[in-house]
């Protein structure tokens, strides 16, 4: 069995709330809701666990105030969870599902930024513990999936450090993040796989904006000597492997909850790529997982 370490610094408690309809500036009464342990890499880990139980392990920080809720939800989904605690609460995201319109609206409820000296010392200690755990487990896994934004309480170069640690252990690193974290990573150690969407690619590599997307990812993957995968919503997915271009059509589905479709794609893609080394098969598996996720209420799932 191939094993994947899923690292999530933006752990989330996801509340998916179902409405017959959602109307702005009105009182909206829900039909029901569900809670899930979430965050981009956590969602990917849930899909991986459904693909093959035991193939994924999650490393993440969790707020101490609502710790048990997150760990109970993770246990319900058979997630192998290794965590460090930090002051405060794990943030929540609320997904509003409009059954009539078939739309998904996500509200991210950010927690107050930790600024007290005592809290920051606790975070620094948690970061050391997290890095130690990751360093210890890297020899036991085949790849690392690092996805999502880095809260400002963590070291500026943490993502670059994690990519370097992964490569020092001879493992594959998939990066699903952008901005300064991606720039610092590229300056230190090139991710084997960069998977982002078209808007994120254009923002991260503005020097490519005078090229078509196909030309841009071909040239950038040649320059970086890696794999770049660009999802484009309902449109086909583009990819380039060291300059060789690939395209994979999406599946048409009747969506229930589109939250975590990208995370589900990451899971299927990396799972299949580790099994076969075949990029075309990996793109198809990622697409299949994203489509199955869209048909379900659970964020990051391929079956109920």
Regions found by a protein language model. Give the residues of each.
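Substrate-binding N-lobe of the ribokinase-like
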Residues: 29-91
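Gly/Ala-rich phosphate-binding loop of Rossmann-like dinucleotide-binding domains
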Residues: 49, 186, 274
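Conserved phosphate-binding/catalytic loop of the ribokinase/pfkB sugar-kinase fold
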Residues: 95-140
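Short acidic, glycine-rich surface-loop motifs adjacent to enzyme active sites
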Residues: 138-152
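Conserved phosphate-binding/catalytic region of the ribokinase-like
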Residues: 211-304
């Amino acid at each position: 069995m191939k094993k994947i370490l899923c690292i999530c610094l933006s752990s989330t408690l996801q509340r998916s709330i179902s409405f017959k309809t959602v109307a702005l500036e009105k009182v909206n009464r829900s039909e029901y809701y569900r809670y899930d342990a979430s965050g981009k890499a956590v969602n990917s880990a849930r899909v991986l666990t459904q693909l093959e139980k035991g193939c994924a392990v999650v490393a993440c920080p969790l707020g101490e105030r609502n710790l048990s809720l997150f760990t109970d939800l993770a246990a319900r989904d058979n997630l192998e969870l290794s965590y460090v605690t930090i002051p405060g609460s794990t943030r929540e995201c609320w997904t509003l599902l409009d059954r009539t319109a078939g739309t998904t609206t996500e509200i991210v409820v950010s927690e107050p930024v930790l600024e007290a000296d005592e809290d920051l010392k606790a975070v620094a200690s948690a970061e050391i513990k997290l890095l130690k755990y990751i360093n210890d487990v890297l020899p036991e896994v085949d790849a690392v999936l690092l996805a999502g934004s880095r809260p400002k309480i963590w070291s500026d170069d943490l993502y670059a450090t994690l990519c370097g640690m992964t490569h020092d252990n001879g493992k594959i690193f998939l990066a699903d993040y952008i901005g300064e974290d991606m720039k610092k990573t590229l300056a230190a150690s090139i991710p084997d796989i960069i998977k982002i969407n078209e808007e994120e690619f254009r923002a991260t590599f503005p020097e490519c904006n005078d090229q078509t997307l196909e030309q841009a990812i071909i040239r950038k993957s040649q320059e970086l000597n890696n794999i770049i995968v660009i999802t484009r919503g309902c449109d086909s997915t583009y990819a380039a492997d060291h300059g060789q271009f690939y395209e994979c059509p999406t599946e048409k589905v009747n969506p229930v909850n589109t939250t975590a479709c990208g995370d589900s794609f990451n899971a299927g893609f990396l799972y299949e790529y580790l099994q076969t080394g075949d990029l075309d098969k990996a793109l198809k598996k990622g697409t299949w997982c994203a489509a199955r996720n869209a048909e379900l209420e659970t964020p990051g799932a391929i079956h109920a």
